[in-house]
């Protein structure tokens, strides 16, 4: 059986089953949320851009927001036979990519994304078992559905496993 590597774009999500991998690139202030079910060997990955959809009148893409994308990813995994109680999470991203002297104008979107993702996963009762968040480096995230291992390629640092 040939394994494939499925790509998840910005403000997108997808699922793969073993022995496939799923990846996303360009995690700056964005966050990659990797959900994994050891029993079914199903892996889900979401690439969120913003913390909270309630600040917007028209939400055309729920996958852009932590508060909407995480429940949507869980529902898609449950539709494939996962039980939410078996899911574990690993997260990466949330960097401060720009240094502004006055962060009050834009806020620290990376930090707000981290907080929103942790809040949403906590509300869903999904444990975060590993994370690589914050800092000021971009990341690529690869989730292996065979064993749930996450490999990060961090700009200027190298490869880190979660």
Swiss-Prot record:
Enzyme Commission numbers on file: 3.5.1.44
Pfam families named among the record's database cross-references: CheD
Gene3D superfamilies, per the entry: 3.30.1330.200
Biological processes, Gene Ontology terms: chemotaxis
Catalytic activity: L-glutaminyl-[protein] + H2O = L-glutamyl-[protein] + NH4(+)
Top EC group: hydrolase
UniProtKB keywords: Chemotaxis, Hydrolase
Any one GO MF annotation of this record: protein-glutamine glutaminase activity
Disulfide bonds: none
The keyword Hydrolase is assigned to this record: yes
Primary role: Probably deamidates glutamine residues to glutamate on methyl-accepting chemotaxis receptors (MCPs), playing an important role in chemotaxis.
PANTHER family: CHEMORECEPTOR GLUTAMINE DEAMIDASE CHED-RELATED
Homology family: Belongs to the CheD family.
The protein's name in its UniProt record: Probable chemoreceptor glutamine deamidase CheD
Origin species: Clostridium botulinum (strain Eklund 17B / Type B)
């Amino acid at each position: 059986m040939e394994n494939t590597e499925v790509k998840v774009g910005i403000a997108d999500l997808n699922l793969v089953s073993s022995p496939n991998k799923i990846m996303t690139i360009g995690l700056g202030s964005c966050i990659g949320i990797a959900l994994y079910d050891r029993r079914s060997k199903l892996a889900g990955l979401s690439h969120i851009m913003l913390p909270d959809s309630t600040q917007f009148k028209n939400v055309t893409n729920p996958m852009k927001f932590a508060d909407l994308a995480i429940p949507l990813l869980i529902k898609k995994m449950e539709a494939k036979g996962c039980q939410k109680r078996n899911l574990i999470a690993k997260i990466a991203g949330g960097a401060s990519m720009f240094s502004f002297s006055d962060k009050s104008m834009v806020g620290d979107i990376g930090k707000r994304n981290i907080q929103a993702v942790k809040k949403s996963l906590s509300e869903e009762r999904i444990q975060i078992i590993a994370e690589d968040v914050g800092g000021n480096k971009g990341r690529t995230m690869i989730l292996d559905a065979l064993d749930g291992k996450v490999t990060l390629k961090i700009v200027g640092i190298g490869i880190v496993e979660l």
